[in-house]
């Protein structure tokens, strides 16, 4: 199982391994070599049919559930060389379940709210989410064979700083369709 990610403002995609998927809403403990944790809000879909080079006409047949979550990135110490952000840290892909029926994205008025615990509230209106997801499924399937159970995630905003080592501990909560979908602490 892969988590295929389309970064914000980029036409290419990359894969995160399944070890990055956080299923149980547990607290995130940062590795010692990471000085900062950044996050990017995402909308994601679960692939329900294997395929390659999926066409726009048939893309709705290839996913059966959607959701909202966040991807965590680690900013390494300066000694790590040319790495800007680390995307393969275990349990750093917060893609909660249960998933929603894709029909919820059709009205374009659903809101994904994130509270970072630092008096910062982020509200994202998902007006183009269905189009973004379907475009990402089509474009990523040109490079990667989709398998049943894969996730395709699209970053809705550029990654931003969540916490630094000096912050110690920060909480993060997310709501979608007026339901709390995740809540955890990031401990540096």
For each of these PLM feature ranges, what is it?
Residues 1-151, 158-188:
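Catalytic-core "active-site belt" of small-molecule-metabolizing enzymes
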């Amino acid at each position: 199982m892969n988590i295929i990610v389309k970064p914000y403002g980029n036409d290419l995609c990359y894969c995160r391994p399944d070890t990055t998927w956080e299923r149980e809403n547990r607290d995130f403990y940062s590795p010692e070599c990471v000085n900062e944790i950044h996050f990017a809000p995402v909308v994601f879909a679960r692939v329900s049919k294997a395929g390659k080079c999926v066409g726009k006409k048939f893309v709705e047949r290839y996913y059966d559930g959607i959701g909202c979550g966040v991807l965590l990135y680690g900013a390494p110490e300066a000694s790590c060389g040319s790495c800007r952000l680390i995307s393969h840290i275990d349990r750093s892909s917060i893609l909660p379940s249960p998933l929603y029926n894709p029909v919820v994205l059709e009205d374009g008025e659903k809101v994904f709210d994130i509270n970072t615990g630092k008096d910062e509230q982020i509200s994202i209106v998902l007006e183009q989410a269905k189009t973004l997801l379907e475009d990402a499924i089509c474009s990523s399937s040109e490079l990667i064979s989709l398998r049943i159970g894969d996730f395709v995630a699209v970053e809705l905003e550029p990654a931003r700083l969540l916490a630094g080592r000096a912050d110690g501990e920060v909480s993060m909560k997310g709501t979608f369709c007026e339901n709390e979908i995740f809540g955890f602490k990031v401990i540096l």
